[in-house]
């Protein structure tokens, strides 16, 4: 497995991986928004390639105070090989190098396998309520 930073050329493969992994696409999960993330934090959008191609990806961000783990996904059929754990550890290392001291992530409440994965990697649940508001374009 080879971990590397994503480029704009990787966007089609990244979108295909997320689709194959069953991730839901939301309003902000469009190429133009992803390009902005990649321009801002190019070293935090990570891919793990193996002999079969793109296996795992994660979209990391850092707002200067908190790091965020977004859209960590492994291709079905390649799960259980440690790819996601390795990619998460590399993202955490890169966030720490930027001065990040706390990492956050959001999981859909009914996604127990993913909750368990993050708990096994040292994350804990907080009793916060997530709210959002879309602003006019």
Regions found by a protein language model. Name each.
Residues 5-71, 75, 88-90, 94, ...:
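Acetyl-CoA-dependent GNAT
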Residues 56, 113-117:
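A short, acidic/glycine-rich surface segment
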Residues 95-107:
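Conserved GNAT acetyl-CoA-binding A-motif
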Residues 81:
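Flexible nucleotide-binding loop
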Residues 118, 123:
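Conserved active-site tyrosine of GNAT-family acetyltransferases
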Residues 85:
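Residues forming the Rossmann-fold NAD(P)(H) cofactor-binding site
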Residues 76, 105-114, 132-136:
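Conserved beta-strand-loop-alpha-helix junction that forms the acyl-donor binding cleft
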Residues 1-2:
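Extreme N-terminal starter segment of soluble prokaryotic enzymes
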């Amino acid at each position: 497995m080879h971990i590397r930073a994503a480029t704009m050329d990787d966007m089609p493969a990244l979108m295909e991986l997320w689709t194959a992994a069953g991730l839901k696409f939301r309003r902000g999960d469009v190429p133009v928004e992803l390009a902005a993330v990649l321009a801002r934090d190019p070293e935090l959008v990570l891919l793990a390639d193996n002999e079969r191609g793109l296996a795992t990806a994660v979209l990391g961000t850092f707002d200067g105070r908190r790091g965020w783990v977004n859209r960590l996904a492994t291709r079905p059929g390649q799960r259980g090989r440690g790819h996601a754990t390795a990619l998460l550890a590399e993202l955490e290392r890169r966030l720490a190098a930027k001065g990040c001291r706390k990492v956050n992530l959001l999981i859909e409440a009914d996604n127990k396998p993913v909750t368990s994965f993050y708990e096994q990697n040292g994350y804990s649940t907080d009793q916060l309520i997530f709210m959002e508001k879309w602003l006019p374009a």
